[in-house]
Amino acid sequence: MTCDYTQLANNGVQQLRPYQPGKPVEELQRELGLRDVVKLASNENPLGPSHRALEAARRSLDQIHFYPDGAGFELKHALADNLGVSSDRITLGNGSNDVLELVARAYLQPGDEAVFSEYAFAIYPLVTLGCSAKPVSVDSHLYGHDLA
C-alpha cells in the first residue's frame, strides 16, 4: 500500500514549492568563463568569518559533544546589557528564518493575510503559507515600503 504523504500536510504547506538556490560560483565561472566572482546572493559573506569567531570556535571544540544552553542565558544577558534592555525583551533563534517563523506561528491564523513588500525577504510568503494564511505582496513606492 502506498500513501501520498503530501496530501496529509495542511493546505498552506501543500502550496509551497522547493527553494531554488542561486548558482554555485563554480558553475557561474564555467558558464561565463570568469575567474574572479564575488557571490553576494544567498546571504553569504564573501569575506568569510571573522578571526575572532574562528578563534572562539576553536576554543569550544572540546565541548562540541554537549548541547548548548537552549535558552541562551549568557548571550541574552550580554545582548541586553549592550542594548540597554531587559533580557526578557530578547528572542533568540537559529537565524532570521527561525525567528520569522516563530512570529508567524504565534500570530497568523488560517485565512489571515500577511502583507509585505514585493522586495521583502523571501521567507515571508513561505512562513505565511506554512501557517495556512494568505501572503499579500504589495508594490514598492518610490523605492520604499508602503504597507498601509
Regions found by a protein language model. Give the residues of each.
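Conserved core of the PLP fold type I
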Residues: 65-148
